[in-house]
């Protein structure tokens, strides 16, 4: 059965992409604090599972792009290591803020639980599960566990969460183990996308340049929503909303709020 997506949220809904990633390093506590400080109504973030089973907030499967480490008194780029191959303890050796600016030196990779605790119960959260293969059950089950745990300590506004993924199988599995939290399928060119949408797997996320008329007509017919990322321009956001898009994900939500 199709679930209303974030039913208490006003439309169009604005999300900060990986926090406020234009002002602070993406997917860090500093970036999520900006969401709170600026009064952004929603936030999108990404999760990966570590080798030791923790759910951490990071976009890439590797720590190379945003991770830094000190070696012989110098700051160097982290090696091309996958999050899934590193323990939580090993990940603590790396700095995930200084790549953005010296101001954010010392930012560590945050746990999803800690981020959700910081955001509280008033901010809407889109949790994107990052998994590009069939080993999705572990990260899906851990996501469900963390959401269950956070709702025990912050039970207000329980319909503030959304789980999304490019992986349609992960979305199907999450819907199977958790019927209370809505899901979203992020559109690329996966041949099974339309099938999963027809089966009620939530709303549709897509980039503005691939907002296909066929998908737009389908979602409207099925009373589903379409949200777009990444939109940083006011005029583009207004044009998309005019087309029927009800959610905007932006690196610069402070300019669109």
Where are these regions (language model features)?
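Phosphate-group recognition and catalysis centered on beta-loop-alpha active-site segments
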Residues: 1-257
């Amino acid at each position: 059965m199709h679930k209303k997506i974030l039913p208490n949220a006003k439309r169009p809904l604005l999300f900060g992409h990986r926090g406020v990633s234009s002002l602070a390093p993406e997917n860090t506590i500093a970036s999520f604090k900006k969401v709170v400080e600026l009064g952004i109504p929603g936030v999108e973030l990404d999760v990966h599972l570590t080798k030791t089973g923790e759910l951490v907030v990071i976009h890439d499967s590797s720590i190379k792009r945003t991770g830094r480490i000190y070696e012989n008194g110098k700051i160097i780029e982290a090696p091309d290591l996958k999050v899934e191959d590193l323990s939580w303890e090993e990940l603590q050796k790396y700095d995930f803020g200084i790549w953005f600016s010296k101001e954010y030196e010392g930012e560590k990779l945050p746990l999803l639980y800690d981020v959700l605790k910081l955001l509280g119960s008033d901010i809407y959260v889109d949790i994107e599960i990052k998994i590009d293969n069939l080993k999705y059950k572990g990260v899906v089950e851990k996501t469900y566990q963390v959401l269950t745990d956070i709702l025990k300590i912050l039970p207000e506004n329980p319909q503030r969460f959304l789980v999304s993924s490019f992986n349609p199988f992960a979305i199907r599995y999450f819907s199977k183990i958790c019927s209370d939290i809505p899901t979203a399928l992020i559109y690329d060119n996966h041949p099974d996308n339309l099938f999963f949408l027809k089966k009620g797997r939530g709303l549709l996320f897509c980039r503005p340049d691939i907002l296909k008329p066929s998908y737009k007509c389908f979602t409207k017919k099925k009373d589903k929503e379409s949200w777009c990322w990444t939109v940083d321009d006011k005029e583009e956001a207004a044009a998309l909303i005019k087309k029927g898009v009800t959610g905007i994900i932006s690196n610069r939500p402070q300019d669109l709020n």
